[in-house]
Amino acid sequence: FGLIGMITIFIAISQTFINSGFSSALIRKKDCTQADYSTVFYYNMAMGIVLYAVLYLSAGVISNFFDEPELKWLVRVLGLDLIIRSLTLIQGTTLTKRVDFKLQTKIAVVSSILSGVLGILMAVEGFGVWSLVARSLTASIISSILLWFWNRWKPSAIFSRESFKELFGFG
């Protein structure tokens, strides 16, 4: 299970680049526009896809560096979490901005319980480290679905350079 620890380093660094402080900038800004939210959403999506592609392509190098052949596919599969989470950063940010921690907690509890049950069942069935991968991806997928269902914010077809510059200056 140390393999997951090795991957977590790369995932955590990538997550930092995906957000780039934009969530904090949106929370700080008093009157966020639809253009602000949509701009950050598309930036997060693009960064999630680009960083996943980098992880996917470098999975063999990472695997060779740690001398762990199984790491190649673990990185590629668990790296999908970057894309999934990039789709929900704005959803979580809008809930935080509205101070709706109750809904955030409900979503976290439901996704943790359901993914935890799956992870335990897979571990009992002998899936080993893949049970942790499935648990992590399942938690992100469930959380994403619930955030999109209950939050109802939808992106517009807007990417504003002005919004990007203003918000990036904070992050």
Where are the language model's segments positioned?
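Generic alpha-helical transmembrane segments of integral inner-membrane proteins
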Residues: 13, 17, 45-57, 83, ...
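Membrane-interface helix-loop junctions in multi-pass transport and translocation proteins
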Residues: 1-6, 60, 64, 72, ...
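Hydrophobic alpha-helix/TM-entry signal in multi-pass membrane transporters
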Residues: 40, 74, 90, 104-107, ...
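Interhelical loop/hinge segments that connect adjacent transmembrane helices in multipass membrane
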Residues: 102, 145-171
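Membrane-interface junctions at transmembrane-helix termini in multi-pass inner-membrane proteins
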Residues: 25-34, 84-107, 121, 130, ...
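Juxtamembrane helix-entry segments on the extracytoplasmic side of multipass membrane proteins
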Residues: 2-5, 67-75, 163-168
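Membrane-water interface segments that mark the loop-to-transmembrane alpha-helix transition
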Residues: 3-7, 11-60, 73-79, 102-103, ...
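Membrane-interfacial segments
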Residues: 30, 62-70, 126, 130, ...
